[in-house]
């Protein structure tokens, strides 16, 4: 699984990469591996695995959601997943990444410069604090996250950023139906409602994946998100 197979998988979805996009993904991989030696960005470093489990996996929401030029916030993107592979694919997207670790922000800033990405901003902050700020609260068309947190927790971290009528998109693994069922109350309390859920298997390794789409139906109550750490310790239930 290298660049060629990555291209063939995307071609199955009617996505054809330009030479510039090919180069951007190639450089992304090189920088990820290089910086990973001095800071913990990912446990996945084999080329075939990075292309499949990071790049391809990050792009899968576009198989179900029409990305164009939306204003998107990525919560806890780590090494830039899923928003930066989506940005490479859809250059008109306006991306904001919020991450609590300043070292990662340093990597992402360098990465964006090297890949010559415009319309990207990085913020060193906790989602619980940024979600209260007038600079971020309910101004985004889409909040996106590829995180291990349960849906009840993730919804509290992400839905406050989304404007009414916008969407929260979560990239999840196996067992997501249970998570969504458990998180139904939290999603509703925060102003969201489940609008779509797409299950599929990641090629080659056939691991379960799910794209969960929550529509922001009404404004999030002012008390949310709660203080840093509280959503995780005391999920809305």
Curated annotation (Swiss-Prot):
Its EC number is 2.1.1.-. One of its GO terms (molecular function) is rRNA (guanine-N7-)-methyltransferase activity. Residues 216-237 are annotated as: Disordered. Keywords: Cytoplasm, Methyltransferase, rRNA processing, S-adenosyl-L-methionine, Transferase. It is found in: Cytoplasm. It comes from the Bacteria. Its main location: cytoplasm. SUPFAM superfamilies: S-adenosyl-L-methionine-dependent methyltransferases (SSF53335). The keyword rRNA processing applies. S-adenosyl-L-methionine binds at residues 76, 81, 127-128, 146. InterPro entries: rRNA_ssu_MeTfrase_G, SAM-dependent_MTases_sf. The keyword S-adenosyl-L-methionine applies. GO terms for cellular component: cytosol. Transmembrane segments: none annotated. Belongs to the methyltransferase superfamily. RNA methyltransferase RsmG family. Specifically methylates the N7 position of guanine in position 535 of 16S rRNA. This is Ribosomal RNA small subunit methyltransferase G. The lineage of its organism: Bacteria, Bacillati, Bacillota, Bacilli, Bacillales.
